[in-house]
Each structure stands twice: as C-alpha cells, then as structure tokens.
Amino acid sequence: MVRICLDCFVEKGLTVATTKDLCKAAKLQNGGIYYYFSTKEEIVLACAEEAISRIEKGAFAIVLEDIRDIKSMMDHLGELADKMSPTMRFLVSVCVSREYGEKVKPSLARLAARYPYYTGRIAEILGCTDKEVAPFVHLSILAINNYMIFAERALFDPQIEAVKKELSRLAERKGRNNR
C-alpha cells in the first residue's frame, strides 16, 4: 500500500495528491485508505520512509556491485539519479514542509546512521581505511542528492569527477580497480 501511495505522491506532488487520489491509485473506495492508515500525516511519513529506502537501496546496490569499476559505478549512479529524481523531489517536499519537516527528521537520522556501515563496506572492498574513503562517500552522496533535486549536471559532474579520481587512486594503490 505504501508503495502505491508513494508512486501517487511522486506523480502528483505532495500538496496536490489528495486522499481521493491515493484511494483511486490503490483501487479503494473513497476513504478506504484510512483502513490502512489513521491520518494523511501517517501516509506521508510512511511514504517518505519508503522514498528513503528506494533511493538508499538503489544507490548502495550499485555501489557495492560496481565498486571495483569506479567509472562504471559512477555512470550507473548518474543513471539512477536521473530515474530517482522525482522520488527525491517528493522527499525534499516532505522535508521542507512546515507540516511534516520536523516529523521526518528521525527517518533522515536513521539513514545518516547507516552511512558508516556503507563507508566500511566500500573501504573493505577497496582495501583502504574508512577514514580514507569517508570524505568521498559523503561527497558522492551530496553530489547525487543535489543532482536528483536540481537535475543539473553542472552541480554533479565536477564533484563526481573528483570522487572518481580519488576512489580510483585509492583502489589502484591497493590493486583493486578494474579501470
């Protein structure tokens, strides 16, 4: 149900999608959505959590699969950013909303708390320390987030090129980069 609602919010927008739209998308009678959720706020926050999950799983699946070929990994992350841009924009609209902004912060904090795990996995694969790779993990996250929000390559390419260069250098130092 959450996935259907998120797709509806992504398509129509946070402020435009009505509970009637959500019911229609879920093939429910008007008001039927409240069988699954108590309030619209509960729906929005569940959808924000799902948006975070989609973006996180998509991005880190690519990273952990392609990290040995850094150029390919960054290309795939750019493609994912193009695809996930509408989802990120929905998430941003929730985060900046007066109604939901404070309430979504715990979900964002849980996401940020998972970054050290990903940093550790990337460092392990590349054969370097967490401390060496952490700045580039965070710069990549920032660049991809900015690109998904603003859909402007000029904000993305310079940061990603810097990350590619430095991650490749780290990987080559350990003989772990295929490119």
Question: What function would you assign to each model-found segment?
Answer:
Residues 1-6, 78:
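A short, Lys/Arg-enriched amphipathic alpha-helix from helix-turn-helix/homeodomain DNA-binding modules
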Residues 2, 44, 48, 52, ...:
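Amphipathic, non-transmembrane alpha-helical scaffold segments
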Residues 47-73:
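Amphipathic alpha-helical linker/stalk segments
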